[in-house]
A protein has these predicted regions:
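Catalytic active-site module of serine/aspartate enzymes centered on a nucleophile-bearing elbow/loop
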Residues: 229-272
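Flexible "cap/lid" loop of the alpha/beta hydrolase fold
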Residues: 103-139
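Conserved HGGG/HGGXW glycine-rich cap/lid loop of the alpha/beta-hydrolase fold
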Residues: 6-53
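Conserved alpha/beta-hydrolase catalytic His-Asp/Glu region
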Residues: 141-198
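Conserved catalytic-core motifs of eukaryotic protein kinase domains, centered on the activation segment
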Residues: 26-28, 51-57, 117-120, 217-218
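Short glycine-enriched nucleophile-adjacent loop
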Residues: 91-101, 106
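Active-site loop/oxyanion-hole signature of alpha/beta-hydrolase fold enzymes
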Residues: 2, 8, 41-89, 252
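Conserved serine/cysteine hydrolase catalytic core
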Residues: 180-225, 234
């Protein structure tokens, strides 16, 4: 299917996948650091931003992963395997593509799917529902209310450790997306299951904000079981959407995670 997207920069292709209720603009703060070194593709997931929500079957997660896999192939030049990075739901999608061996590498920022049990998943989805309920209560007064920092900053605090980094226009767009998104209500039905056999040859990087209030950092301990090859790091002082909290740091993590394999091997050899 065709998904709304933007392409900029040059170098190895790096596809960036946002989280649930977000938009491809979630990555805007990184583009200046990434595009001199990567051909960056930012995409709106189905039912997000400018991408339409297709008719969904019983396996919503599998359908999303297949749609993104098809999209990645469409936007990647012939003869190249793309690198993929994602945040939250986008992080899980990136890891799923790595598990299937569909991509050159995967970098996941506070990825979904590592809930310690079903109650943990319920807690995460109910957090989104509570935030959406608050935004809906504001109704037509939402644009005016968000102009006040005393309202805007607390409204964003679940997602960002530093909500002051989010401008008014972006905050309004994000809140409207939260209100209108239809996938949140399917969150409890989503099956976060990896293939029985995970490709261990695909490089994986997982970075988790220590101040993540949506998907707490304790979930990170579950990453190594399915991805023993993963480079796992905890990021002090960063929240669920770390791209906005610390653009330069996250850019460096994405560049390192998507380093071509040959260069990666040389770096390791030199370090040794």
């Amino acid at each position: 299917m065709t998904l709304s997207h933007d392409i900029s920069g040059s170098g190895p292709t790096l596809v960036l996948v946002h989280g649930i209720v977000h938009r491809r603009q979630a990555w805007d703060s990184l583009l200046d650091q990434l595009t001199p070194y990567r051909r960056v593709v930012t995409v709106d997931l189905p039912g997000h931003g400018e991408s339409l929500l297709p008719e969904l079957g019983p396996d919503v997660m599998g359908q999303l992963i297949d749609d993104v896999s098809e999209f990645v192939k469409e936007v990647t030049p012939a003869g190249e395997r793309a690198h993929v990075a994602g945040n939250s739901l986008g992080g899980w999608i990136a890891l799923s593509l790595a598990a299937r061996g569909d991509v050159a590498s995967a970098t996941a920022l506070s990825p979904a799917g590592f809930f310690v049990n079903h109650l943990d998943q319920v807690r995460a989805i109910n957090t989104f529902r509570a935030l959406r309920g608050t935004a809906k209560l504001m109704g037509d007064g939402l644009p005016r209310a968000l102009r006040y920092k005393l309202i805007r900053y607390p409204a964003l605090a679940a997602f960002f450790a530093h909500p002051s980094h989010v401008g008014y226009a972006a905050a309004l767009a994000d809140c409207r997306s939260l209100v209108s998104n239809e996938l949140v209500d399917l969150g409890l039905e989503m099956d976060f299951a990896l293939p029985p056999i995970v490709d261990p040859t695909v490089p994986v990087t997982v970075a988790w904000g220590r101040r993540d209030l949506i998907l707490p950092v304790y979930q990170a301990q579950r990453v190594k079981k399915p991805f023993p090859q993963a480079k796992l790091m905890v990021l002090p002082g960063l929240g669920h959407v770390p791209m906005t909290d610390a653009p330069e740091l996250i850019s460096s993590i994405l560049l390192a995670g998507s380093e071509p394999f040959g260069s990666r091997a040389k770096s390791v050899s030199a370090a040794g």
